[in-house]
Swiss-Prot record:
Keywords: Disulfide bond, Knottin, Plant defense. Probably participates in a plant defense mechanism. SUPFAM superfamilies: Cyclotides. InterPro entries: Cyclotide, Cyclotide_bracelet_CS, Cyclotide_sf. It comes from Viola cotyledon (Violeta). This is Cyclotide vico-B.
Amino acid sequence: GSIPCAESCVYIPCITGIAGCSCKNKVCYYN
């Protein structure tokens, strides 16, 4: 929830989700 994963999730889910990232405010964040 605090560290950006350098990925947006406006149109597609977070590919970095496999690394623990999740979508928040159209941006992928880690924890």
